[in-house]
Amino acid sequence: MHFPVFIMQNHQRRALVLFSGGQDSTTCLAWALDRYAHVETVAFDYGQRHRIELDARLNVLREIRGRFPAWAARLGQDHLLDLKVLGQVGDTAMTSDRAIEMQANGLPNTFVPGRNLLFLTLAAALGYRRQLDVLVGGMCETDFSGYPDCRDDTMKAQQVALSLGLGSRVTIETPLMWLDKADTWALADSLGGESLVQTIVEESHTCYVGERGQRHDWGYGCGECPACVLRKAGWSRWAERAPR
């Protein structure tokens, strides 16, 4: 797959990246830094079982600032918002210690109802205050677990609702929407080369159960939860296409 090269001078808008510290959001952060004049990041502490991601994201930010001077010049403030109420309204395997399994509705019990809708609403409110009119998220409906709040139709509807509700234009960018996980690895490579790929492998965190003791070719994780399965399979497919 060919990925276009974005020239920063053509895009002077300011962006806020929903940045959890996982593979997808790290790739989206690189994409935004390659495209926009000023980029800030926001994460949410919602009582997630894998809250180690909140530490991982700081390591990713440190590496990006150290390895990519041009991006570091565009990378602004990082924000962390408290959203623990999500654990109260949506008791799931993402916020409590229980086995991960499929439900009768076809969704895994890691689905946190309304999570991305709340994330985007709060991000838009923060962006409004800080003049950041582009929201960038790693939502995808290609290689995904079926979460309805990751779908393109949901993002388009949310963009309209936020723009109307705030009385100003809000753009939601989802650069991974139509990419599978192999394409996501390839996009990271095209944006930041081996240095970015290794940052994602070593520093990002995707595993739902918070496992950092097992190191694989594709990074750290249990290797069995839905997030690890997708990340591992994507790495394998990408490695077959472009042997390292």
Curated annotation (Swiss-Prot):
Cofactor info, note text: Binds 1 zinc ion per subunit.
Binding annotation for Zn(2+): C207, C222, C225, C228
Pathway: Purine metabolism; 7-cyano-7-deazaguanine biosynthesis
Entry keyword annotation includes Membrane: no
Domain of life: Bacteria
EC number(s) on file: 6.3.4.20
GO MF term (any one): zinc ion binding
Keyword vocabulary terms for this entry: ATP-binding, Ligase, Metal-binding, Nucleotide-binding, Queuosine biosynthesis, Zinc
Binding sites annotated in the UniProt record for ATP: F19, S20, G21, G22, Q23, D24, S25, T26, T27, C28, L29
Swiss-Prot/TrEMBL catalytic activity: 7-carboxy-7-deazaguanine + NH4(+) + ATP = 7-cyano-7-deazaguanine + ADP + phosphate + H2O + H(+)
This protein's record includes keyword Flavoprotein: no
Listed Pfam families: QueC
Cofactor: Zn(2+)
Biological processes annotated in GO: queuosine biosynthetic process
Family annotation (InterPro entries): QueC, Rossmann-like_a/b/a_fold
Role: Catalyzes the ATP-dependent conversion of 7-carboxy-7-deazaguanine (CDG) to 7-cyano-7-deazaguanine (preQ(0)).
Family: Belongs to the QueC family.
PANTHER family: 7-CYANO-7-DEAZAGUANINE SYNTHASE
Listed name of the protein: 7-cyano-7-deazaguanine synthase
Organism, as annotated: Bordetella avium (strain 197N)
